[in-house]
Amino acid sequence: TYDAIQLLKLSDVAGALSMEVHNGITSPFEEDLHTIRPQSGQLATARNIRNLLEGSGNTTVATQQRVQDPYTLRCIPQIHGASKDSIAYVKTKVEIEINSVTDNPIITKEGHVISGGNFHGEPMAQPFDFLGIAISEIGNVSERRVERLVNSQLSKLPSFLVKHPGLNSGFMIT
């Protein structure tokens, strides 16, 4: 779970950089929007993005011509936040498990022998499934932001971030 937590921190940084590159609209990160849906991961992500973008000259506000950004930008708090919440749940379950007895049978302090099912892996299997889903969602939205970055039809940047295409293929295989 340590690597997953670090990945989520870096994902917020990548999300903020995407906002900068695309002159993202900052209103989707305003605190008022997130306090009315107080999911802890969502709140934390919105706060992180606000902090990372503080003082940026490369973001913008909504206008009549451009009311909102695509999901990959404006839903960063909801997507990253849900993954943060899932990973926090997994971390809690792992901490319980590594501090538990999973022997069978167990012998109490009083010498009483009890056969049971504490050896069963389901209490870890389900959280690890959640972990896989959480990381997959981060990968999915990250890939979509990369596509937006290298596709000149979706950004104001040259295709594959190459100024002079030809022999130089830039980020064609990202």
Please provide the spans of the model-predicted regions.
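Internal alpha/beta core interface subdomains
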Residues: 1-22
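Short helix-capping/linker segments at secondary-structure and domain boundaries
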Residues: 2-6, 26, 139-144
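Short acidic-hydrophobic sequence patches enriched in Asp/Glu that either
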Residues: 7-10, 41, 170-174
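Short alpha-helical "patches" and their helix-cap loops
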Residues: 9-12, 30-34, 144-155
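Accessory "access/gating" subregions that flank catalytic or transport cores
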Residues: 16-140
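C-terminal catalytic subdomain
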Residues: 122-174
